[in-house]
Amino acid sequence: MAENRMSDGSDDRAAADPASAAALFDRARQRLGRAPREHLGRLIVPGALRAAMGARPRVVPDGRAWRVGTLLIGDTAVHEVGDVLRASEERRRGFTSDAARRRAEAEAMCVRGGFEPGTVVNVDHTGIDLSALAAEGASGPLSVRDGTVVIRWTSSGAVMPLEAYLREKIDMLPT
């Protein structure tokens, strides 16, 4: 019987079990170790009463995670990347488009929520349910194809095995 070892010493049978996605992320966390993490932010919209008294929407800290390609890997959770903002002070400026105006407003919400100007903040990230992946065969950009957990890593739908994706992306990160 042939041994099922991959080039990095891992067992390729683990990648065929959807429940093993959790184990792949655990190994990724160990490899990431001291790599820099980015902030996660959560949008808080004031209720009608607070808004009437002048409260404005803000983005507040909601943890930290390693950004690994299209994924945000936290200590216990995994998310799909949403919008990535750089917190900046609110100021009057000319805009060439409504999209630029909305982005500047979102960046100012980060400062109102407590982030230092210049801080990278990930907002609108979507949680990935690894138990749903095991039960239903898909969650977020992850799915199971032919018994292997794969990740959709481009908007056009390109996929690759999650284990190879994590290995490649982590190898490219600064440590």
Model-assigned labels for residue ranges:
Residues 2-31, 37, 110-175:
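Low-complexity intrinsically disordered segments
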